[in-house]
């Protein structure tokens, strides 16, 4: 059974509007899974509308920011699947988790 926090995150994400179609994420089933990994730590899986979507990184970042805006959420990990460049999308969306980059 999903936690109360993950349910609130789902409700928030379902209200986001897709930039390409102008329809809500909840209508499009873009978000495929939301789970609470630890207290305040949320993992969100999503599938872009197209395997070649140029907006996959932007969509992932919007999902992350929206999830972080929910009271009680301390950290968010976003995972993209179904995109031609899943690994790159995931790295770019979650790059701030690695901490600041050292200066050269």
Explain the meaning of each model-derived region.
Residues 1-104:
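Domain-level signature for proteins that mediate thiol-based redox and metal-cofactor handling
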